[in-house]
Curated annotation (Swiss-Prot):
Plays an important role in promoting lung pathology in both primary viral infection and secondary bacterial infection. Promotes alteration of mitochondrial morphology, dissipation of mitochondrial membrane potential, and cell death. Alternatively, inhibits the production of interferon in the infected cell at the level of host mitochondrial antiviral signaling MAVS. Its level of expression differs greatly depending on which cell type is infected, in a manner that is independent of the levels of expression of other viral proteins. Monocytic cells are more affected than epithelial cells. It is found in: Host mitochondrion inner membrane; Host nucleus; Host cytoplasm, Host cytosol. InterPro entries: Flu_proapoptotic_PB1-F2. This is Protein PB1-F2.
Length: 87
């Protein structure tokens, strides 16, 4: 933990960030504007990168032939042909 210019000491206790005031009391700290802006930028960038990859993976997955479905389809078609021949 370091002290930056214009930024009070910041202590991280578990998931709650607190800042130490001049009188020694700790108060809950709101996230610094720059870190909030940076996180928003990071999330936006990750969404732009991750979403197209997810779409590509889904398209690949959907384009793959599912062996079980192919097996069932051929089995049903064979039975249908046999059944229709007997009638």
């Amino acid at each position: 933990m370091g002290q930056e210019q214009d930024t009070p000491w910041i202590l991280s206790t578990g998931h709650i960030s607190t800042q130490k005031r001049e009188d020694g009391q700790q108060t809950p700290k709101l996230e610094h504007r720059n870190s909030t802006r940076l996180m928003g930028h990071f999330q936006k960038t990750m969404n732009q990168v991750v979403m197209p990859k997810q779409i590509v993976y889904w398209r690949r997955w959907l384009s793959l032939r599912n062996p079980i479905l192919v097996f069932l389809k051929t089995r049903v078609l064979k039975r249908w042909r046999l059944f229709s021949k007997h009638e």
